[in-house]
């Protein structure tokens, strides 16, 4: 059938096209049927939503579809039913526990990107990976397919370094120090980062406090070839586009298949042209990987996958049992990171981790002798060279290179929790800290978050401040206070834990 495009000023939350009920009956189309829209220039796929938002002879295009494909109001398109793609058969094959061939994986990924697969079919694929897993042949094929269906970056400055943390630790502003340290040593490090999904601040959220983070690949290439580094939001790029689609299914199902996680991370490194990749795997209670044994197994997978992609990969297993530094939330973390770069010093957990990771990269890149990377990284930080490189990054990304930490605005609604008793800090709950910061409005409210005054092992007296919540509104502050009282994020105990009498 022929139909005129009507642009709908709405997001449907899915990749849908809207057809009038009478029109759908005539065309024998049903809800969720896959259709293709053909014009002289392109073919676009979408799932049918039957709605009287559009009239007979019209097809409604939501903003979800417009984000990827250009349509004009009133443009005439041909609407045709589309049968189930071949990739559905391959998904069923994986559901049955069978190994997928390279061409089958490539077909699935291409159909995900082209939107030939509907949400339910993508969810089935993700579930099959969670239940039946992928071997390394399949993971490598999936990684390359995810990268090659998107844009690829080609930077002339070599070698190209990269670092990625699998996350889970609140306050992880480490890479805001690592990137300028590594670039100040003469290595190239184009860092793409994510925004927060379940955390209180992704690296991109923090960097955005003092610089722009959304750039095209051409703009990134220009910045990196000029100054050797960038810190940008990966979501603004068409890198491994299948990943963004499958992540939605993972979130909805609350699952994270290991093979898909490996492919998700490494496909973007492959697309960025990274030659040397350092993976940071934090371990500890309340993070994604809780034991060192789990971390070692995952490390072996990353290293093996890197070999198959032609990348040299090393893994750092790091302590993730409590927040890094003293702040959680975009603006608060930006202040702390900038202060550390300006002064060359800062909280021990932040400086130790940042110089440790940067040192490994300096050794991997051949600018520091084996075993001397951390010392060199600390010297670069303390000399002010890393801060000068950070100023260049901020300026090239459209920010003010002269900005001072105290000039970064933070929430003006605050509440401080104090120690209810004297004793020692025996635990800080990562998930609770993140939950409080998010309840306060982070990451959407840049000035929201938490400032911690204590760390595990420290002694406190009754009435000593433990942490302050920052919010941009009274309502958000009240919400965070209620959450904090319920969550009890900091545990204080005396040296005598329990007294037991005669039994």
From Swiss-Prot:
Reaction catalysis annotation: AMP + phosphate = alpha-D-ribose 1,5-bisphosphate + adenine; CMP + phosphate = cytosine + alpha-D-ribose 1,5-bisphosphate; UMP + phosphate = alpha-D-ribose 1,5-bisphosphate + uracil
MF terms in GO: 1,4-alpha-oligoglucan phosphorylase activity; AMP binding; pentosyltransferase activity
InterPro entries cross-referenced by the UniProt entry: AMP_phosphorylase, Glycosyl_Trfase_fam3, Glycosyl_Trfase_fam3_N_dom, Glycosyl_Trfase_fam3_N_dom_sf, Nuc_phospho_transferase, PYNP-like_C_sf, PYNP_C, Pyrmidine_PPase_CS
Any matching Pfam family: Glycos_trans_3N
Coiled-coil regions listed: none
Active site, per annotation: 256
Binding site for AMP: 168, 194-199, 203, 264, 288
SMART domains for the chain: PYNP_C
Any GO BP annotation: pyrimidine deoxyribonucleoside metabolic process
SUPFAM superfamilies assigned: Nucleoside phosphorylase/phosphoribosyltransferase catalytic domain, Nucleoside phosphorylase/phosphoribosyltransferase N-terminal domain, Pyrimidine nucleoside phosphorylase C-terminal domain
Cysteine-cysteine disulfides: none
Gene Ontology cellular-component terms listed: cytosol
Keywords: Glycosyltransferase, Transferase
HAMAP family: AMP_phosphorylase (MF_02132)
Biological role stated in the UniProt entry: Catalyzes the conversion of AMP and phosphate to adenine and ribose 1,5-bisphosphate (R15P). Exhibits phosphorylase activity toward CMP and UMP in addition to AMP. Functions in an archaeal AMP degradation pathway, together with R15P isomerase and RubisCO.
Name of the protein this chain belongs to: AMP phosphorylase
Source organism of this protein record: Thermococcus onnurineus (strain NA1)
């Amino acid at each position: 059938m022929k139909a005129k495009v009507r642009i709908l000023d709405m997001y449907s939350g899915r990749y849908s096209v809207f057809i009038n009920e009478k029109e759908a009956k005539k065309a024998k189309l049903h809800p969720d049927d896959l259709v293709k829209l053909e014009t002289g220039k392109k073919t676009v796929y979408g799932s049918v939503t039957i709605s009287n938002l559009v009239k007979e002879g019209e097809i409604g295009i939501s903003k979800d579809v417009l984000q990827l494909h250009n349509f004009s109001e009133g443009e005439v398109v041909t609407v045709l039913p589309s049968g189930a793609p071949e990739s559905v058969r391959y998904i069923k094959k994986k559901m049955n526990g069978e190994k997928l061939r390279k061409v089958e994986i490539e077909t699935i990924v291409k159909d995900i990107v082209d939107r030939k697969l509907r949400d339910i079919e993508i969810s089935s694929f993700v579930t099959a990976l969670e239940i039946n897993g992928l071997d390394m042949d399949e993971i490598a094929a999936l990684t390359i397919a995810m990268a090659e269906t998107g844009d690829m970056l080609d930077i002339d400055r070599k070698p190209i370094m990269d670092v990625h943390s699998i996350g889970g630790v609140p306050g992880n502003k480490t890479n805001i120090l690592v990137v300028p340290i590594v670039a100040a040593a003469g290595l190239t490090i184009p860092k793409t980062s994510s925004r927060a999904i379940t955390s209180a601040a992704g690296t991109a959220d923090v960097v955005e406090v003092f610089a722009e983070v959304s750039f095209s690949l051409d703009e990134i290439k220009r910045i990196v070839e000029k100054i050797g580094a960038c810190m940008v939001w990966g979501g603004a790029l068409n890198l491994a586009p299948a990943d963004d689609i499958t992540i939605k299914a993972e979130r909805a199902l609350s699952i994270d298949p290991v093979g898909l996680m490996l492919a998700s991370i490494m496909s973007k490194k492959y697309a960025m042209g990274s030659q040397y990749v350092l993976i940071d795997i934090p371990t500890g209670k309340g993070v994604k990987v809780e034991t060192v044994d789990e971390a070692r197994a995952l490390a072996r997978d990353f290293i093996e996958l890197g070999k198959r992609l032609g990348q040299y990969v090393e893994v750092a297993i790091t302590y993730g049992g409590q927040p890094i530094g003293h702040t959680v939330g975009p603006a608060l973390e930006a202040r702390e990171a900038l202060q550390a770069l300006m002064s060359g010093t800062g909280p021990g957990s932040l400086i130790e981790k940042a110089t440790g990771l940067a040192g490994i990269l300096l050794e991997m890149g051949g600018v520091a002798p084996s075993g001397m990377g951390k010392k060199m990284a600390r010297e670069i930080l303390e000399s002010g060279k890393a801060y000068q490189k950070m100023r260049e990054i901020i300026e090239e990304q459209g920010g003010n290179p002269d900005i001072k930490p105290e000039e970064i605005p933070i929430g003006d609604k605050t509440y401080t929790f104090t120690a209810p008793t004297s004793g020692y800090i025996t635990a800080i709950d990562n998930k609770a800290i993140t939950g409080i910061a998010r309840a306060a409005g982070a990451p959407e409210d840049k000035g929201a978050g938490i400032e911690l005054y204590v760390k595990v092992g420290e002694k406190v007296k009754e009435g000593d401040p433990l942490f302050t919540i920052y919010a941009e509104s009274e309502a958000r502050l009240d919400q965070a206070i209620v959450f904090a009282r319920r969550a009890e994020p900091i545990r204080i105990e005396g040296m005598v834990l329990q007294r037991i009498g005669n039994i």
